[in-house]
């Protein structure tokens, strides 16, 4: 009887493990190269799209250095960065062209390396690092109060619900490090944020409902945390 129980439990554990594996896409298995030079944007974006289309899952980025242009996160997708993973943002300003209109007709001019709009249940987890390379001369054109082109953020989520960002390290943003605008149910925990490479290097700008921020270390050039209320609704 005991042997039968053990066999049943083992079979259940195998089934559970298989379901986890089935719901995870390792981007290196799709051709991504962590050499710090290869542009991995298309491969990672396709993995995000596939996970979301199937109802959800994890996009796993193993240890290595991955150059990317902006990646759009989508509903029910967890972007997981292994320990030793480094995402490097493109240093071409022309790559950050994801402006869009708000519902009131005004135009948003900002952009983000990892961005989402109108999505649900999105997360960024793991102990990897995201480096915006914001100290590059491409992004050195002064304080935003002086006008001129808009510099990109590292994380920019707009009108999203159910956001979890935990444990990752964020560094060297060209502008604000992260911005959660018109979002709801936001959990930010255990982040390490370092950015002294450009003007207006806020660590965290938040304009959201039901947000919890805890256990973060923020060392930046401008405001560590900036609470905003730009949208009365």
Regions found by a protein language model. Name each.
Residues 1, 13-15, 225:
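Short intrinsically disordered, low-complexity coil segments enriched in acidic
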Residues 1-9:
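Bacterial N-terminal signal peptides that target proteins for export
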């Amino acid at each position: 009887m005991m042997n039968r129980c053990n066999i049943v439990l083992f079979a259940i554990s195998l089934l559970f493990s298989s379901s986890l594996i089935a719901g995870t896409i390792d981007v290196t298995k799709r051709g991504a190269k962590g050499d710090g030079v290869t542009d991995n944007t298309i491969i990672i974006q396709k993995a995000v799209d596939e996970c979301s289309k199937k109802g959800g899952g994890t996009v796993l980025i193993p240890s290595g250095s991955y150059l990317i242009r902006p990646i759009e996160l989508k509903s029910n997708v967890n972007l997981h960065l292994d320990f030793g993973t480094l995402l490097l943002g493109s240093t071409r300003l022309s790559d950050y062209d994801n402006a869009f209109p708000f519902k009131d007709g005004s135009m948003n001019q900002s952009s983000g390396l990892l961005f989402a709009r109108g999505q649900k249940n999105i997360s960024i987890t793991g102990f990897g690092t995201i480096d915006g390379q914001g100290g590059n001369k491409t992004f050195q054109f002064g304080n935003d109060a002086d006008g001129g082109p808009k510099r990109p953020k590292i994380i920019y989520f707009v009108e999203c619900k159910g956001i979890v960002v935990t444990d990752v390290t964020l560094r060297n943003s060209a502008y604000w490090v992260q911005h959660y605008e018109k979002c709801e149910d936001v959990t930010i925990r255990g982040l390490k944020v370092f950015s002294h490479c450009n003007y207006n290097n806020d660590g965290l700008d938040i304009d959201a409902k039901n947000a919890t921020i805890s256990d973060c270390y923020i060392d930046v050039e401008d405001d560590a945390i900036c609470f905003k209320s730009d949208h009365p609704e």
